[in-house]
Amino acid sequence: MQMKILMCSVPDGSLSNTLKPLLPRGNHYQVPIQPVGILRLMTWIEKKGYSSDIYDINNLRPSDEELIENFKRTKPTVVGLSATLSHCYPNVKRISKILRKLFPNIWIVLGVI
């Protein structure tokens, strides 16, 4: 069975309210951050012969329904969650619960990239 690796950037959920508004995200604003660390890791993964994809949750800010739809469509076997700050924990927990409910045997890897 081929691994389907999905790399996800996790939103912090609290610092965005204190930053200068640049991009509207519902009732708050978020400065767009490019997931450079994730992209570098994906390059390494692909050099090792695996395929990977990215889901930029931090900048897209999808609803739970949109998360579920994306995860069902991509059907990952491994998900990497990049959480850059401790403020990300509530979203890490929320996303992990959604993944575990959809795919009980999925590997969820958490890192700071």
What annotation goes with each model-predicted range?
Residues 1-113:
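A short, structured N-terminal alpha-helical element that caps or precedes a catalytic domain
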